[in-house]
Amino acid sequence: MEKIILVDEKDNEIGTGEKLDIHQKGKLHRAFSIFVFNSKGELLLQKRSESKYHTASLWTNTCCSHPRPNQDLEEEAKRRLMEEMGISCDLKEVFSFIYKANVGELIEYEFDHAFVGRFDGNPKPNKDEVEDWKWVNIDELEKDIDKNPEKYVPWLKIALEKYLNR
């Protein structure tokens, strides 16, 4: 079973737990979201695999995951970016935020660290993780999220607004 890090509202570690159990009980845990932009300022989105146990086949930011216990957060973000999207690039943490969202029968309650990177080219996504991908203009993405929120994971709108208003 995959263990993830439980935290308080200041991101202090308070323990670990099994990922599914934490999502079932809606406990606050550490996560990260990665936003990779190309030189045209477009954001790389991924469509989550239909096999994901929540928010399957929905569009999200470039990569989002949970760091493993006792590992460096930035290194974990780079590791997952390579595993999911086949991309290696420098990442910089730009902000963090807490959000809570119902996702089917589960609850995402995360202290989310947002990282930004730059990459030009095509990703080589892991088909077990990613159903599709695309580069998008931020203004067009904002409009589409407002028009078609059901196509996107709930945390994308929150994170995007925080990124644009930082």
Residue ranges and their predicted role:
Residues 21-32, 42-79, 83:
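Conserved Nudix-box catalytic region and its N-terminal flanking loop in Nudix hydrolases
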Residues 87-96:
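A short coil-to-beta-strand element that immediately follows conserved catalytic motifs
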Residues 34, 63, 93, 113-115:
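A structural signal for short, well-ordered beta-strand segments
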Residues 1-33, 39:
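Acidic, metal-coordinating catalytic segment for phosphate/diphosphate chemistry
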Residues 37-39, 117-118:
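Active-site beta-strand termini and strand-to-loop segments that position acidic
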Residues 18-20, 57, 69, 95-98, ...:
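Nudix hydrolase/Nudix homology domain
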